[in-house]
Amino acid sequence: AASYEARQYGINSAMASSRAQKLCPNGIFLPVDMSYYRAMSHRIFKEVLSRITGRIEQVSVDECYMDVSGALLRWGSPSAIGAWIREQVALRYDITCSVGIAANKLVAKMASTNAKPNGMLMIPVARHAQFVQMMPLRGIPGIGPSLEKRLNAWGVDSVADLARMSLES
């Protein structure tokens, strides 16, 4: 894991600690107990998320996509489900979490990222394109520093710039 303070130095959770220490030599690096994280993750998925739906795609110890379309009659709305998840995770485990709600995985992931460190953001279908286009390039999952630099060299500084480009450009 990388704290929000560490992320300001370009450190991310997938980065090797040796590289992170070069980027932030005065940082405090704590040992990671992955077995504990996996156990907590398993409990949260079993005790909280599975109570909503069985349609869960877990992508890491702390991230998943849920298709809640079959749960709406019982729960009322996606935002009610998201609020309940955040409440239960906080009450049961004293852990904060962010929830992104959208009609597809890409926009849901971007909404969750924008809701960090402890919020919820719902993007209605009619606003998907507008939301994505207002994002900086790095706001798109998969665009890291090197791809961003290449796009910048081509005059692309935002998702809106990217959307305006033709295939011939």
Tell me the role of every PLM-derived stretch.
Residues 69, 107-109, 148-154:
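Short hydrophobic alpha-helical segments that form membrane-spanning helices or hydrophobic packing faces
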Residues 77-138:
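Long, highly charged, low-complexity intrinsically disordered interaction regions
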Residues 37-41, 57, 77-82, 143:
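Hydrophobic (often cysteine-bearing) scaffold residues that line and stabilize catalytic clefts
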Residues 62, 72, 96:
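Active-site pocket-lining segments that scaffold enzyme catalytic pockets across diverse folds
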Residues 66-86, 115, 155, 167:
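Catalytic palm subdomain of template-directed nucleic-acid polymerases
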